[in-house]
């Protein structure tokens, strides 16, 4: 029996995405908007993934992840793309671009927000500002919020509200089986500091705080 090559697996994945009742958005190296979608904070032209997939929901992430796991397709996950070693991209792996999972749902009464896995810090700050709220964020607006938070989360508000990692109250994760799960206590403990090792985080719940006064002192 012939062994599948990496190229044939990528082609099979592209056909799978196109064949869904609602086709899953994706681009290849030959797509006219590939360079724009591939562009990021660290632009290394030698890191050009053969396929960039752009899911729009946690369910689509699970669908794609299940297929790639089943067929042995290696992939990376990209949001802000600020990894200093460029690990958001590999030339021999699919990139799962989560930036369309950018919803921010604010509960003013409960003082929490549900933040999509692809939310950039600029999107979060804007959404919170519209409601007179604030949460710890980094100083660079194009950083992906969850990647920043789960690996420490240092920023200008940490002296008042704590580190970004302290803000993760709950999380929704696509696990190694390609299933969407709510993080239990053990998984939450792992996510707070090493989240990328435990699955694809598609949503977190964080506390938010009324923005009452802004000054140089606070």
Describe each model-derived feature in a short phrase:
Residues 9-11, 165-170:
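A short, compositionally biased
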Residues 134, 171, 176-218:
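C-terminal cap/substrate-recognition region of VAO/PCMH-type FAD-linked oxidoreductases
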Residues 1-160, 217-218:
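N-terminal accessory segments
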Residues 128, 166-168, 214:
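Short gly/pro-enriched beta-turn/loop segments at secondary-structure junctions
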Residues 19-21, 89, 143, 166, ...:
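A generic structural signal for short, non-catalytic loop/turn and secondary-structure boundary residues
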Residues 159-165, 190-192:
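Short Gly/Pro-enriched turn/cap motifs at secondary-structure boundaries
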Residues 100, 108, 117, 139, ...:
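Short, structured patches in soluble enzyme cores that scaffold and shape functional sites
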